[in-house]
Amino acid sequence: MAIRSYRILTPDTRNRSVSGFDGRVQLDPQKKLTSGQHHCGKGRNGRGIITARHRGGGHKRLYRQIDFRRNKEHISGEIVTIEYDPNRSAYICKVHYKNGDKMYILHPRGVMIGDTILSGPKAPISIGNALPLTNMPLGTAIHNIEITLGKGGQLARAAGAVAELIAKEDRSATLRLPSGEVRLISENCSATIGQVGNITANNRSFGKAGAKRWLGKRSEVRGVAMNPVDHPHGGGEGRTPIGRKKPVTPWGYSALGKKSRKRNRYSDASILRRRE
């Protein structure tokens, strides 16, 4: 969908832009495919202590139950609607299967209302179909990729995300992920063909701080604006430098270039090249 800009009437609309909804995108979900969600604490743990900073507030949302497994094998489904989902950057599709089931899936780019999709090992190589990696040709663009067989897609699910199948060898498939990481995944795991829709989601401009607060994101305060008790960069008279060779986090760790991934993880052997 194209990015829509506002006519300048107030300061907050001067630089604000949103994803343009056309007649195809609906806003009201089907009630049976939604559930309530309670954001307890907004970044706090069970004791009320902040464990994830810059979270809080936000508009109340209904969770749309998305089918990431795509395990309706050999049962064709028709795309009935394309809908907005406040819980993710991508749009979602409502699918009516021939056996009567109704489910939401991620909207693949190029899929239109009335199109038919299929899942299973014998599904054709077509956008929106889900099948195991072993049945896909090399160079296929995919999204919603499983890491563990049967668990459902976990990789390449954001708006505009797409991965590439670049090799298959010894019951493993080599994928190039959107982050630039190259890793091995079992070729029995399934994925959906195509790219996730709403590719212009990153081009929008919020225009004001309140638009971020609607999403449950609080402002980030600079360390030099804090007191010494709150941040290693804090304190001093006036515009004082941080007093260190390199910037650090609030807990004293290096803030630039330090790898934060834990060592000796079980998945290290599957990663052939780190992300860029």
Swiss-Prot record:
InterPro entries: NA-bd_OB-fold, Rib_uL2_dom2, Ribosomal_uL2, Ribosomal_uL2_bac/org-type, Ribosomal_uL2_C, Ribosomal_uL2_dom3, Ribosomal_uL2_RNA-bd_dom, Translation_prot_SH3-like_sf
GO biological-process terms attached to the record: mitochondrial translation
GO cellular component: chloroplast; mitochondrial large ribosomal subunit
Pfam families per UniProt: Ribosomal_L2, Ribosomal_L2_C
Segments of this protein annotated with the region Disordered: 225-276
Principal subcellular localisation of the protein: plastid
Keywords: Chloroplast, Plastid, Ribonucleoprotein, Ribosomal protein
Localization per Swiss-Prot or TrEMBL: Plastid, Chloroplast
Single GO MF annotation: rRNA binding
Subunit structure: Part of the 50S ribosomal subunit.
PANTHER family, per the entry: LARGE RIBOSOMAL SUBUNIT PROTEIN UL2M, RIBOSOMAL PROTEIN L2
Family to which this protein belongs: Belongs to the universal ribosomal protein uL2 family.
Protein name: Large ribosomal subunit protein uL2c
Organism from which the protein derives: Pinus thunbergii
